[in-house]
Structures are given as C-alpha cells and as structure tokens.
Amino acid sequence: MSSEQYKEMVIIQKTYDMIEYAYVCMRQFPKSEKFTLAAEIKTSMYTLLKLLIAASKKYYKKTTLQEIDIELQFLKTTVRLATQLRN
C-alpha cells in the first residue's frame, strides 16, 4: 500500500468517526433544530464522505478535491452556526 492510499484511507476513517461522534452530539439538539439544522449537517457529512470515497477512486482528483473543500467549508459554517445558536 502506498503512502497516498494510506492517507486516503485515514481521512475516510476520520470522516466516518466524525459522523459517529456528530450523531451523539446532534441528539442534544432542541427539537426545533433537529429536523432542520441537524438534517443539513447530516447531509453535508454524508456528501463529504461520498466525495472522499470518489476522490480516492479517481486518477484526476482536482475537481473532486475542490468539491470536497466547498462541502467542508459549508459543514464548518453550519456546525459553527449550530454552536452559536446553542449559546
């Protein structure tokens, strides 16, 4: 296994772990946010995982990596918003 393949596997595993942890955290969301903001975060995390898997299978990764960057920025923003709304 090359170091590039290993790095790809690590980031996919870390994203998987993030999703598991986020589910525990999102159980504490108020009902009003569970079906809107929490659903948006879940969708974004699944999209991120899907894009990472797709990037690991492609030879030319540039456009997929740009999509991953956009999705990750959106996920960061929604999680930050959820944190601020909680306070």
What name fits each language-model region?
Residues 1-87:
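Amphipathic alpha-helical assembly/interaction segments
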